[in-house]
Amino acid sequence: MKTPENLEEPSATPNPSRTPTERFVYLEALLEGGAPWGFTLKGGLERGEPLIISKIEEGGKADSVSSGLQAGDEVIHINEVALSSPRREAVSLVKGSYKTLRLVVRRDVCAAPGHADPGTSKSLSSELLTCSPQHRKATWSGGVKLRLKQRCSEPATRPHSWHTTKFGETQPDVSMMQISQGTMGPPWHQSYHSSSSTSDLSNYDHAYLRRSPDQCSSQGSMESLEPSGGYPPCHLLSPAKSTSSIDQLGHLHNKRDSAYSSFSTSSSIFEYPPPGGSARERSGSMDVISARGGLLEGMRQADIRYVKTVYDTRRGVSSEYEVNPSALLLQGRDAHASADSQGCAKWHSIPRGKGTPSPSWSQQCSGSLETATDNLPQKAGAPLPPTRSDSYAAFRHRERPSSWSSLDQKRFCRPQTNSSGSQKTPFAEDQLHTVPERSPENSPPVKSKHNYTQKAQPGQPLLPTGIYPVPSPEPHFAQVPQPSVSSNGTVYPALVKESGYTAAQGTCNKMATLDENGNQNEASRPGFAFCQPLEHNSVTPVEKRPEPTAKYIYKVHFSSVPENEDSSLKRHITPPHGHSPYPSERKNIHGGSRACSNHHSLSSPQAQALHVGDDRRPSRLSQPWEGDFQEDHNANLRQKVEREGQGQGLSGNSGRTRSAFSSLQNIPESLRRQSNVELGEAQEVHPGGRSKVEDPGRKAGASDIRGYLDRSVSYPRPEGKMNAVDSVHSADSRYEESPAPALPQTSGASQRRLSSSSSAAPQYRKPHCSVLEKVSRIEEREQGRHRPLSVGSSAYGPGYRPGRTGPTPSTSSSDLDDPKAGSVHFSESTEHLRNGEQNPPNGEAKQEEASRPQCSHLIRRAPADGRGPPARGGEPSRPEARLLRSQSTFQLYSEAEREASWSEDRPGTPESPLLDAPFSRAYRNSIKDAQSRVLGATSFRRRDLEPGTPATSRPWRPRPASAHVGMRSPEAAVPSSSPHTPRERHSVTPAAPQAARRGPRRRLTVEQKKRSYSEPEKMNEVGVSEEAEPTPCGPPRPAQPRFSESTVADRRRIFERDGKACSTLSLSGPELKQFQQSALADYIQRKTGKRPTGAACTPEAGLRERAQSAYLQAGPAAPDGPGLASACSLSSLREPEALPRKEHTHPSAADGPQAPRDRSSSFASGRLVGERRRWDPQVPRQLLSGANCEPRGVQRMDGAPGGPPSWGMVAGKAGKSKSAEDLLERSDTLAVPVHVRSRSSPTSDKKGQDVLLREGSNFGFVKDPCCLAGPGPRSLSCSDKGQNELALPLHHPTPCWNGSGCKATVASSAPPESSGAADHLKQRRAPGPRPLSAGMHGHFPDARAASLSSPLPSPVPSASPVPSSYRSQLAMDQQTGQQPPSSPASAVTQPTSPRSPELSSPAYGLGEGMWKRTSLPQRPPPPWVKWAHAVREDGLAEDTLAPEFANLKHYRNQPSRPSSCSTSDPDTPGRISLRISESALQPSPPPRGDYDDEVFMKDLHPKVTSSPTFEALPPPPPPSPPSEEPLVNGTDDFPPPPPPQALCEVLLDGEASTEAGSGPCRIPRVMVTREGHVPGAAHSEGSQIMTATPPQTSAKGSEAESNTPSSASAQPQLNGSPGKQLCPSQTRNLTYEPVERTQDLGKKTHAEPQKTSEDIRTEALAKEIVHQDKSLADILDPDSRMKTTMDLMEGLFPGDASVLMDSGAKRKALDITARRAGCEAKASDHKEAVSVLVNCPAYYSVSAAKAELLNKIKDMPEELQEEEGQEDVNEKKAELIGSLTHKLESLQEAKGSLLTDIKLNNALGEEVEALISELCKPNEFDKYKMFIGDLDKVVNLLLSLSGRLARVENVLRGLGEDASKEERSSLNEKRKVLAGQHEDARELKENLDRRERVVLDILANYLSAEQLQDYQHFVKMKSTLLIEQRKLDDKIKLGQEQVRCLLESLPSDFRPKAGAISLPPALTGHATPGGTSVFGGVFPTLTSPL
C-alpha cells in the first residue's frame, strides 16, 4: 500500500532535510511464504545511507504485484518495526520474519512518481493518515509497531517470514544484507533463504516479548544482529506478532549474544521494554529509539495491517489482533513525527537522563537514529557524535547485556542527531519507550514501568474494550514498548505509535491533537499529547506542534508507554532537561512551565538541537515534560481506553489515543477503527473533554512541571481514581495514573476513564490506596514533607526510571516523605529528576541530583509507597505499581513498582534489561540471563555489580528505572509467570517479575553463589539483585535516603534495590515476598517465641512489609517487597536481615541506605552498599538535612506507618527480607544464613521482638563494635569490605563504623562521609546514628525510640558514645536489622582497621570462625553470625545456643567463606555473607542478629575490657573452641585470623567506650554462647563470652579459662600450632555444638586441645633443650610448623570432629587427663612450652632416615662448654622424656578409648545395616553398602596420602642448601605425584559426599528420624574415628620418636637425678647410645609409617 507522507509539520520533522509531504509515498508490502523474500537491502546506518531495496529478484516474493516494491524504495519499517537504518538490523528483522514479511517503504514520488498509485496511497492514507514525513515517521514510530491490519493489497494476516531487506542504498554493504531466516552474518548474503522465523510471530512475539529483549534477538535476529554494526531496530520492531520484529529485536537486543551484545540489548529492548521501562531502557539507545521510530514508521506503512499479538501471561494465551493501519498510521504518523522530532529529544533526554550531555548525544542520536531508522531525507542530518558521557553511558549499557545494549545506546546516540523526531518516534512508540528506557538516562524507563501496564494490555487480547483486567503481565510479542507488562507493550512500537498516532491525527488537527490529557497530540508528541494537559497543549496547539515534534515524540513514547514509561520519558526528558543546555528548560520543568514541559521532550539533545532556536523549545520542554508524563499516562489511559474499547466513552482523545495504542497493542480492529476515528474525533473530543480535564489538571498541577510531577506522581500514586483505573488496567492505569498528579482533572478523567473502562481499576486502586497509598500517606504524613525531594524521587521512582537520582533522590525523598506530596512530589521529583538528573532545574533539582542515587532507590521504593504525596489525592500512586499489584499482589505491585522505580532509576543501567525481562522474561530472559551471567561474570560484572565504578557513571542512569520498571510494571508480574525469565525466576511470585535482570549478567559474589547453590531456584535473584543494585548503588543510593520519607517498606525496597544490585534479582513476586514475610514471621515466632510485630518485631515488620506489600503497604511495601523479596530470596539469606536492619536503621536515616541492605545480599549489593555509601554523600546530605535525615527516617519509620507502625513497616521490610529468609529458612540451616539472619530480617525480627531485651543482651558487640570501633580501622578493612560487609550490619552505627565515614555517619555528618562515610552511609543506609536516631525511634518505638533518639546523636557524634546511643542504635539496628551491629562492631573493630572487620566478625559471635574471618578484614559477616548467637541467646538457652552455634559454626564456616568472598567485596561480604549467615542462624540467630548488634556492642565493651574478650568473642562460635581446627575448617577458605589478642585489642579499643554501658548486659549471654561454642575462644574470661557464658563455660569453663591465655595467643597460631589446640574437654564441652566440636576435635587431634601446665612445661623444656642441643631442634622444636596428616586432611571431614567429640569425649577426656597428669608432673613456669609431642610434629618433619641420622648425630659426643650445662640439659632431657612418656601414655589411653568407640560405632553400623537391609530395596541396600565401604577406603586413602604428602613436604622443607639436586628433584617428583593422588582422593571424597547424600535421601524414605540419626551418626563417626585414630597414631609415633631422639642424645652413662626415666612401653627396651640399658631396654626402632 502506498501512502503519501505528509511532511506538513516541520516541527515534527526530525530532520529538516525531509522533503515535502508530497514527495514521498509510503507503501506497505506484505510478502508471504517465507524466505527467500527476493529483494536485497543496501545502505543503512553503517553506510550513512538509507536502507534501500537495491534489487528485487525477478519472480521473487518481492517482485509480486501485490508487494508493489521497487528497487530504490527506502525501507522504513520491517514487520512494523521502524528501522534505525542499520542494514544489519533490517536484515535481522527480515530474517526474523517467519512466514510473512511486512515492509513499509518510502518511495520518492519524484523519483518514482507513478509508483504510488492513488488508490494505494489513499488506502494507506486512510489507514496511515497522511502526515508529514515526520508525522508519518512519528506515526510509524508511535504506531509502527502495530502491523497494519489491512493493507489494501494484503491479506488480513501477515505471515511472518524472514525476507532479505537491504536497508538503504546508503548502506551499500559489501555484503548485501541477505536475510537468511536462520542466519544473519555480518556479510549478508544476497540470497534470502532460511525461513524467516522458526515460529510465527504471533506465537513468537509473546514469548519474544516475554523474553528479555536480548533474547528476542536470540530468536534469530540475534544472528542478524551480530553482523549489523548499526543500531538494532528493536524499537522498530512492532510488538505485533512480527517474528522478524521480534527476531530483529531479539537479535538487536541480544546483548547477551556476543555478536549482538552491543546492540542486541537495545534492539530487543526497544520492541518491548522488559519490565516497566525496561524495554525502553533496554532499547535504551537514542538511536535505537530513533531507529525504532523510523523503522516503525516504515513498518507501519509496510505493515499497514498491524497485527497485534497480545499474550495474556495470566491466561497463557496469545492473541493476535489486527489494528487498523489508519488509526495506527495516523497516530503513528503523528507519533512518528513527534517521535521524529521528539524521539530524538526523548532519546536525548534519555542520554541526558544518564547524566550525559543530553543535547549532543540526544541530537546526535536522534538525528542519527532517525536517519538510520527512517532513512528519510529529513533525517539526513548527520548524527551528532554521541556525547562522551552519553556514549559512555550507552557503551556502558552495551557492555551490560541486560541493559540496553551498547549498540542500542550507540544507536541511541547516533540517530538522535539526525532527527529528534525519529528518536522520539521510537520513544513515542512503546517500542521507543523501550529504547528510552535503555537510554542511559532511562527517563523513559519510568514510563516503561507504565509500559508494564501497557504490556499487560498486550498480554490481554486486543479487544475493542481494551480494558482487560488481565494486565497481560508479560505479553510475548515484540511490542514490549511498554516495559510494564508485556501486554501493555504488546504492540510496543505500534502502541507507542498508536499513542503517537493519536497524537499524529491530532497533529493533523492541532487542537484535536490534544490527547486524553487534553494535550495536543502532535505528530511530534503523539504520545505526549495525550499525556499533556490541555493547558499547555491546548494553549499552544500549533506552537506545541513544532515542539511536540520532539515533545510529542517523547510523549508518544510515553503515550505508548504507560505511566511508567511516561515517567521514564519524563525522566529521560528531564535529564535532558536537567542536562539540557537550556537552563530555562530545566527551570521550566521545575517551574512547571509549559515551555519546560514541551522543552522537556525537546530536552533531548536532538530536540533541543532542532529546537534550540525555537521558542517552543522551552515550551516544549515544559510541555513535553508534562506532556511526556501525561502522554505516558495518557498512553496508559489510551491503552486502557482502548482496552475498554475506544468507543467506551473515555475522552475522545483518550479513546483515540488508546485506540491507536490499542490497535497497536491489545485492541482489535474495532479498537483500530476507533483509533482511526477516535484519533480524529476523540482527539478533538479530548481537546474538549480530556483536554479540559488535563488542562485543569495541569492548572491544578500549578505548573507544567507540577503537572508533570503530578502525572508522574499519578502513576506512582495509588490514591487517586487512577488507582482504581490502574487496578483495572495494570498497564493502562499506570500510564494514566502517571498524569494524574499533574492533571488532577486529567487524572480524574483518566481515572474515570480507566475505572469506567476497567473494573479492576477500583480494585487495584483499593489495594494500592489501602496499602501503598495508606502506608505512603501515613509515612509521608509522619515524615511530613520532610522528604519532599525524596517524595518526588520516590513518586518518581516508578515513573522516574532514569533514576537520574540527582534530583530524583531529593524529590523522591521529599515526595515520599509526604503522603500528599508523595504523589505530587513524586511528579515533581520525577520532573526534577529528569531535569535535575542532567541539570537540576533549580536547587531542588540539583539537590535531587545530589541525592540522585537515593532517588533511584527512592524511586524504587517510592513506587510502593504512595508514589506521590497524598496531596495529589486524585492521582493514582503508581499506575504501574498499582497494576502490578492488581495483577498479582499488592506486594507484586509494590514490588514491581519498587522494582520499576528502581528500574527507572537505572533504565540505562545494565539492569535496564530487567525491564524487558518481564516481557521476554520467559525464554529470552533465560537465555539472556545465561549470557548475561557469562558476560557479567567476565566483563559486565564490575559495571553491573560494582557500585562504585558503575555507580559513578550510572548516577544519572540508575538501573532502578529500568529494572524497577520491569519489576514494577504489571509486566513484572508477568515475568513471574514466565518461568523462563531468570529474573522472574528469582521472583517466586508470578506477579513479581521485577526481578527481571536489568543489566548484563552480574558476577555473583561467593555469597550469592552460595545462595544460588543453596537456593538454585533463586539463582537469578542472586545475579539480578546485585545487578540491579549496583547501578542504583551509585547515584540512586543517595536518592534512597529520600525514600526514608516513604513507607518503611518502600525505603527498604529502595535500599534493597540499592543493595540489590541484588535486590532486583532477589526481588521476587509480591506473593513470594508475602509468603516469605509470613514464613519469616512464623519462623521468628518459632525460634524466638515472639512474633515480630510493628517496630519491635522486625521480622514481622518485614513480613508485614512484605505482606504490607499486599495489604498494609500495598504500594510501598510491595515495591520494596519486590526488590526486597527478591533480595530476600536471592540474598535474603544474607541481605534480608541486613536490609531489615538497614531498613530499620535507614528508615530512620534515610531509606536510601536501607535498600543496599537487601541488595547487599548480592555480592553486588555489598558493593553497591559501598558505592551507595560513596554516593551517600548525597544520602548523607539528605540524611544530614534534617528532613531527610532524621525527620525522614523518624517520620518514615514512625510516621509513615504511624510511628511504631512505620517502624513496624521497617521491621516489615526487615521482615520482608527476613521473609525471604524465612523462605530461605531452609538455607538458614546453612552456615551462610547465619550472617544473613543476624544481619537481615532475622535481625529485624528479633530486634523487633527482642530488640528491647536484646538491647541488654550481649550480642551486637562485634558488629556494633565494628562501627563503634571507630572509623579508622573500619574504614581500612571495614570501610571497604568490612564496610560493605559490616556496613549493613553497622548500618545504624554506620556513622561509627566507617572509618571517618563511620563517625561522620554516626555524627550524621553525611558530608564528611560523603566519600567514605557517604559510602558507608549508603551501605548502612541509615548513615549511622542519625538514621538510627530517626530509625531507632521508629524501629524501636517501644524502648528504643526514646533511647534511640538520644543515642543517635551520641553514635552520630562519635563511636565512643555508642554505648548508650549505640545501644539505641543497636536496638535500632536490631529493628533495622542492620546498623547497630554495624556500628558497634564497626566502632569497636574499626580501631583495628584491618582486624576491625575481622574482630567484628568474631565479635559477632563467629568465634574462631569469625576470628578467621577477622583475619580477613572482610570478616564482618561473622558479626551477623554473632548475631545469630545473640539470637540464640535471646530465643534459646545457653545449651540451645551451643547447638545453634554448632550450626552457626557451619554457618560461620560457610558464611566465613562467603564472607571471605564477600569480604573481598567490600559491600558484598558483610551483606551477602551476613545475610546468608542469617539463614543459617535461622532459629534465634535472626533476632540475635539484631541483638547481635546490640550484644555486639555490649560484647564489645567486655571485649574492650579485656583483649581476651575479643578472643572470647571469636571463641563463641562453635568453631572457636576448636579454634584451630574449627577455625581452619571454617577458615578453610579464609586466611587464619590475626591473633585474637590483636583483634581483641582493636575491638577493645573501639568497644571499651562503645560497649561500656550496654556491653555488660549482653556480654554474659554472648559470652555464654561463645564460651560454649569456643572453649578456647572463651579462654579469656574477661571476654564477653566468657563472662556471659558461665553456664556453658561450666563445661568448658576451666578449659576456657586455661585456654584463655593460650587461646588468645594460640588462636592466631591455632592452625599450625599444637599449643593452639583446645583441650579435649573443651572440645567435648563443645559437643553441644557438633560442628564446632567436630572442628575442635579435629583441630584438637591435630593440635593439642588445650595446653595444660604439663604441656606448657614440656614445651618449655623442649625449647630449652633445643636451645642447647640443636640436633634435637627438628624433632623437639615446639614452634616447628611441619605439615601433618591432619593438616592435609583439614576441611575434608569438617563434621568429624564434632561427631568424634560426642563418641570420643571419653577418649578425649582420658587423653587430656593423661596429658594433664604428665604436664602436672612436669609442670613448669614455661607457659609457652607446648607439649613437645603436639607442638613438634617431628614425625612429620623428619623422615625415618633423617631421624636415624639425627640419632647418630646425637650419639656423637656433645661438646658442651660446661659440664654443668650439659648435665643440666641432660636433666631437662630426662624430665622431658618423662613428660613425653606421660603424654604418650595418655595418648595410648585415648587410643584405647578411641578403639572402643570404633567398635561401638561399628556395632551401630551393623545394626543400621541390618535395619537398612530389611527396609530398603536390594539395589538401595547395595548403594548403602558400597557407600559405607568406600567411605572407609576413601578416608584411609586420604589419611595415607595426606601423611605421605606431609612427610615429603616436610622433608623437602628440611632439605639444606647442600642437598643434591637429584634428591630434591626426587622429592619434588614424589610430592607432585602424591599431591596429584591426594587431589584425586579429594575428588573421590567429594563424590563420596554426593553418594552420601543420595544414600541419605534413600534412607530418609525408610528410616525413622531416630534411625536416620543413628545412621548419620554412624557415618560421621566412622570417618571421624578413622581420622582421630590416625591423629593419635601420628602423635604417638611422634612422641615416641621424640623420646627416642632424646634418649639417644643422652650420654650413655647419664643417670637422671630423679631416678630411672620411665619410658613408654614401646621404648622400654631402647638401649642408650652407650649400649647400657639405662632405661631397662633397647628402644625399638621407630619408623614413621607416614
From Swiss-Prot:
Entry keywords, A to Z: Actin-binding, Cell junction, Cell membrane, Cell shape, Coiled coil, Cytoplasm, Cytoskeleton, Developmental protein, Membrane, Microtubule, Phosphoprotein
Chain coiled-coil ranges: 1844-1890
Q: Where is the composition biased (Pro residues)?
A: 1513-1524
**Which Gene3D superfamilies does its entry note?**
2.30.42.10, 6.10.250.3120
Q: Which GO terms describe its cellular component?
A: adherens junction; apical junction complex; apical part of cell; apical plasma membrane; cytoplasm; cytoskeleton; microtubule
What start and end residues bound the annotated signal peptide?
A: none
Q: Which residues carry this modification: Phosphothreonine?
A: 909
Null-mutant phenotype, please?
A: Death at birth due to defects in neural tube closure causing exencephaly, acrania, facial clefting and spina bifida.
Location of the ASD1 domain: 927-1023
GO biological process, any: cellular pigment accumulation
Q: What is this protein for, i.e. what is its function?
A: Controls cell shape changes in the neuroepithelium during neural tube closure. Induces apical constriction in epithelial cells by promoting the apical accumulation of F-actin and myosin II, and probably by bundling stress fibers. Induces apicobasal cell elongation by redistributing gamma-tubulin and directing the assembly of robust apicobasal microtubule arrays.
State the protein's name.
Protein Shroom3
Query: What high-level taxonomic lineage is stated for the organism?
Result: Eukaryota, Metazoa, Chordata, Craniata, Vertebrata
